[in-house]
Amino acid sequence: MKTAKRRIDVNLEELDRVLDGARQAPLSEEDHDKLKGALHALVAMLARSPNNEKTSAVLGKPEGSSTSGEKQPAANAARKPGHGRNGAEAFEGAKKVPIAHPNLRHGERCPDCGKGNVYGQKEPKVLVRIVGQAPLAATVYSLERLRCGACGQVFTAQEPEGVGPEKYDETAGAMIAQLKYGSGVPFYRLEKLESQLGIPLPAATQWEIVEEAAEVIKPACEELIRQAAQGEVMHNDDTSMRVLQMEREPGDDRTGVFTSGIVSTRDGGRIALYFTGRQHAGENLGEVLKQRAATLPVPIQMCDALSRNVPKLKAGVEILLANCMAHGRRQFVDVAENFPEQCRYVLEMLGEVYGHDAEAREKRMTPDRRLQFHQEHSSPVMTKLHDWLEAQIAERKTEPNSGLGKAIKYLLNHWRPLTLFLRVAGAPLDNNIVERALKRAVLHRKNALFYRTLHGAQVGDLFMSLIHTCQLCGANSFEYLTELQRHARELAASPAEWMPWNYRQTLDRAGVG
């Protein structure tokens, strides 16, 4: 078990006083301890891995436990998906080249024994060969020109079939958008890469290409927002963003800029939306819900407990609010080093609930069956945990203003929305799906640092929404963006037929796929 470190209370004013005093005279023993403790705490926070919050990683194994008593996997247990080499069927985007035998045909006499006939096998021998290539390639066509010596008429060779009139075709815009807004590669970095590969592609040119493409495929994003508004469960959250040139509306005293993420689930599918500006996640969700059909049942909203994530809805419009269990759990993870025994109890109790939810997911339970399952198995656990939390405060076992006390009060204050999954079918446990979606915006912020203008941010939101929705529904985002540009007229006429989950069927009906 990890031992709790000595606690040193310090604030920024004290640190400023210590640093100012160090200019005049050597540090006292007390000031030295404060400064050293603050630096050690900062280093510990920076070094702490945010990717592993499992109870065993946070607190270690409990005393007296041993690996000998742990459940060992069966020798014949099925291996989890994702392990081992990729088979040929995994290369869905690869070019398929069938190769016939040069000398034999199905049903011909065997050249080896001369007695039997050869028949095609069900499974051919498969070879996979992977080659490298530039993200954007170029072809230079040299069209021969002939000039008459008498009349001066010039005759130019015809360009090859399939060469379009535009210098940058639809695939160029799709690839730049995929790299920039899907993979976090800034324009300047792609410019350097292409330059090294002998393909000049200035950052300004890249922006012009994606800006033009965004205008063409805008109807698809607008339809995506409309369909997201009809969702059964809506997750939302936001993260900070930076926009260099952003005009402020008269009377607007907000200084922050945010990228809001919304993930809407509907009929088992998921839609991801991004909105960048001064509005918070709740306000952006409210704008989306304005397009919701009045005949639909009340949706579930999943978010953390911040008030800015809850939309202000007009009279007659309702939502069922659910709060994120992972945020409540993280309150105890953050103070586990100082309160190991109490935090272990809470984390293990919540672990049981997550275990039940994982079992329901593995068994592919319907929302109603999942609700019944949680009521049978998770409700007693949560009731026991609630009684324990109340006893910690009521019986003064925990100081209310301590880190543990604040974590306990967080759960108690938001207990009803935290436990919506025990009362409403389909209510999720946490908001992790939108946290993962926001990583795309965080990746852009980390690599590109900022958007230059709000218009640039809106272009980024459009592409991120389409690309991440493709990822959620298993579609090829590069192919999808390409086809939207190629069929811009059809997209404008009927955008509902050009969603990431149905555009292939639309192409097949048109005889293009």
Task: Name each model feature, range by range.
Residues 1-166, 235-236:
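Short, flexible loop/hinge motifs at secondary-structure junctions
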Residues 120-122, 156-159, 243-245, 271, ...:
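Short helix/loop capping segments that flank catalytic or ligand/cofactor-binding pockets
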Residues 172-183:
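Short, amphipathic alpha-helical "recognition" segments used to contact nucleic acids or chromatin
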Residues 184-193:
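Short, charged amphipathic recognition helices of the HTH superfamily
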Residues 303-308, 312, 348-513:
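Acidic/histidine-rich catalytic cores and adjacent linkers
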Residues 68, 194-199, 209-312, 318:
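RNase H-like nuclease fold core
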Residues 233-234, 300, 305, 316-348:
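Conserved beta-strand -> loop -> alpha-helix junction used to position metal-binding or nucleic-acid-contacting
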Residues 46-49, 110, 148, 176, ...:
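Mobile genetic element proteins and their domesticated derivatives, centered on retroelements
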